[in-house]
Design a protein with these regions (language model features):
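Vicinal oxygen chelate
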Residues: 2-3, 5-13, 39-41, 45-50, 53, 57, 64-89, ...
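Short linear motifs in intrinsically disordered
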Residues: 27-31, 81, 98-104
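Core segments of cupin and vicinal oxygen chelate
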Residues: 9-56, 94
Length: 139
């Protein structure tokens, strides 16, 4: 028997606010709403597609009464595709993220941030084409 990773579920106080933040971060869309719940994704899942192949999971934000009290045991890493890591961190700050010190130390190639409800995530290496890269045959 095989399973598929279909959803990542985040408990939160304000599903609408976090869904809007993460839609802006990941260029996702809201694909479902319900009482105290918002689901976002890069695609509209169907049973047939999920059965046929592994598809990217959606993210579901569910309203809970309690707040976050400790560092996450699981976090997301995001890789910018059209900006440097620092430029993307600046964009995310403008969207409502904050920089977080979790003991990572100075001089790291990634930036630790938190979403508007304090859930940590990392902005890691940029996947943007670099004008400074040399072709493979150059030395």
């Amino acid at each position: 028997m095989t399973n598929r990773f279909t959803e990542l579920v985040l408990d939160c106080h304000d599903p609408e606010r976090l869904a809007a933040f993460w839609c802006a971060v990941l260029d996702f869309e809201v694909i479902d709403r319900g009482e105290g719940k918002v689901e976002i994704g890069s695609w509209q899942p169907t049973v047939e597609e999920v059965r046929a192949r592994q598809m990217p999971p959606t993210i579901v934000f569910i309203r809970v009464p309690e707040g976050k009290t400790v560092k996450n045991r699981l976090h997301l890493d995001v890789s910018p595709i059209d900006a440097s890591t620092e430029d993307e961190a600046a964009r995310l700050l403008a969207l409502g993220a904050t920089r977080v010190d979790v003991g990572q130390g100075p001089g790291r190639s990634w930036v630790v941030m938190a979403d508007p409800e304090g859930n940590e995530f990392d902005v890691v290496r940029s996947l943007a084409p670099s004008a400074q890269r040399l072709p493979a045959d150059c030395s």
